[in-house]
Amino acid sequence: ACIDRFPTGTCKHVKKGGSCKNSQKYRINCAKTCGLCH
């Protein structure tokens, strides 16, 4: 599983919530942990 550094959830959860589009820190973190955050 692809878990990011934020305790709020996995990259999948972040992507579903739209945070990747709205937050640069989530995009950067997801890129480090599990590839591009679309």
UniProtKB/Swiss-Prot annotation:
> Which residue positions does UniProt flag as site: Important for binding to potassium channels?
6, 13, 23
**Region of interest (Crucial for binding to potassium channels), residue spans:** 25-26
Alphabetically, the GO molecular function entries are:
potassium channel inhibitor activity; toxin activity
Q: Where in the cell is it found?
A: Secreted; Nematocyst
Q: Which UniProt keywords apply?
A: Disulfide bond, Ion channel impairing toxin, Nematocyst, Neurotoxin, Potassium channel impairing toxin, Secreted, Toxin, Voltage-gated potassium channel impairing toxin
Pfam families found in the cross-reference section:
ShK
Gene Ontology CC: one annotated term: extracellular region
What's an example GO BP annotation here?
envenomation resulting in negative regulation of voltage-gated potassium channel activity in another organism
Q: Where is the ShKT domain?
A: 2-37
Report the domain of life of the source organism.
Answer: Eukaryota
Bridged cysteine pairs (disulfide)? 2-37, 11-30, 20-34
Q: What else is known?
A: No cytolytic activity on erythrocytes detected. Not active on rKv1.4/KCNA4 and rKv1.5/KCNA5 channels.
Q: What does this protein do?
A: Inhibits voltage-gated potassium channels (IC(50)=405.0 nM for rKCNA1/Kv1.1, IC(50)=0.03 nM for rKCNA2/Kv1.2, IC(50)=1.31 nM for rKCNA6/Kv1.6, IC(50)=74.11 nM for hKCNA3/Kv1.3, and IC(50)=247.69 nM for insect Shaker IR). Binds the Shaker IR channels in a voltage-independent manner.
Which family is annotated?
A: Belongs to the sea anemone type 1 potassium channel toxin family. Type 1b subfamily.
Name of the protein in question: Kappa-actitoxin-Bcs3a
Per the UniProt record, the lineage of the source organism begins with: Eukaryota, Metazoa, Cnidaria, Anthozoa, Hexacorallia
